[in-house]
A protein has these predicted regions:
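Short, low-complexity, intrinsically disordered N-terminal peptides in bacterial proteins
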Residues: 1-2, 159
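RNase III-family endoribonuclease catalytic core
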Residues: 2-112, 122
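Short, low-complexity, polybasic intrinsically disordered segments
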Residues: 111-115, 145
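Glycine-rich, mobile lid/loop segments that gate access to catalytic sites or pores
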Residues: 118
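Short acidic capping loops at alpha-helix termini that bridge into adjacent secondary structure
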Residues: 125-128
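Pyridoxal 5′-phosphate
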Residues: 131-135
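Short acidic, Gly/Pro-enriched loop/turn segments at secondary-structure junctions
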Residues: 138-140
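C-terminal edge-of-domain segments
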Residues: 142-159
Length: 159
């Protein structure tokens, strides 16, 4: 059995009047992520970590923001496609550890639903997914509520 680790990072600007997609759900907020797709920073981060672990490039390579077919796309669809790619190479997820950096809103109450949705998309157990949240203590673009960022580390295995 071999083990591979991947790391992902993503940032999206927050803008008033947009839905705030995070972890596959809409989180109530006055702002939402600005992006070519639905701007789900957590799913994009996980996709990048998985693709990196499997040495398959990054999310931009597979789903370019210049391609019309990805305009406004639900990021859960992208995640499912990434899972096909890594499974085609013989990999399975060991675990995912992620952190969302966001000043507001407090997202703790939404994390269980995010984990459930992500587990369904990836066909893994909820216990294989960790989602944490933190602020930047009002520092940087996150602290000024101009954007949201996320980090993820994944372990994949191949028998």
């Amino acid at each position: 059995m071999s083990f591979r680790v991947g790391f992902g990072f993503d940032v999206h600007q927050l803008k008033a009047g947009l839905d705030f997609w995070l972890g596959g759900i809409i989180v109530p907020h006055t702002k939402g992520g600005l992006g070519h797709s639905d701007a789900d920073v957590l799913i994009h981060t996980i996709c990048d970590a998985l693709l990196g672990a499997a040495n398959l490039g990054d999310i931009g390579k597979h789903f370019p923001d210049t391609a019309a077919e990805y305009k406004g796309i639900d990021s859960k669809i992208l995640l499912k496609e990434v899972m096909v790619l890594i499974r085609n190479k013989g990999y399975e997820i060991g675990n995912i550890d992620s952190t969302i950096c966001l000043q507001t809103p407090k997202i703790g109450p939404y994390i269980p639903e995010m984990k459930k949705i992500l587990a369904i998309c990836m066909d893994v157990d909820v216990d294989q997914i960790s989602i944490k949240a933190t602020t930047t203590e009002k520092l940087s673009f996150v602290g000024r509520e101009e954007g949201v960022s996320a980090y993820a580390t994944v372990l994949i295995t191949n028998e």
